[in-house]
Amino acid sequence: MIWAKLLISVALGAVSIVAALGIGAVGNLIGAGIAGIDPVWDISWNQASSLVAANVLGLLFGFMLGVLIRSSAAAIVGYFIYNFVLAGLTAVLAENQEWFRDLQAWVDFKYTQGMLFEGWPVGGEAWAQLGVTTAAWLVLPLAVGLVLVRRSEVK
């Protein structure tokens, strides 16, 4: 049952970005028509695929919170705290503390996930940062949550 929810989360992330790109294309046509200019199609497949990956990671993070906390309401609150409060605090810390600015890409999953909205990481260090933060903030807590769910499920 839990694996079906995981697959649905991944599929939902991919489909939602495809739908958003379609809505954006229609908006581009309408906006260009209203403004009397030619529509601009400057998003590459590389950017579109990294958008899908960023969205899927975000949904997987929400899924992980749901599995780990095992309360939908608490997981939703945790997701918003993580995305808005913690992300804001780490941004302020990075802006004001040079030591954290240098460390942020290695410890802040939201920061490294956000880089995917600009395109795929370039270079080995950027991929390593994405891997380290994904492992620490997503994979490890998800594994713990899955073990806890498996122990608590009625057979």
Where are these regions (language model features)?
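Short cytosolic juxtamembrane segments of multi-pass membrane proteins
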Residues: 150-155
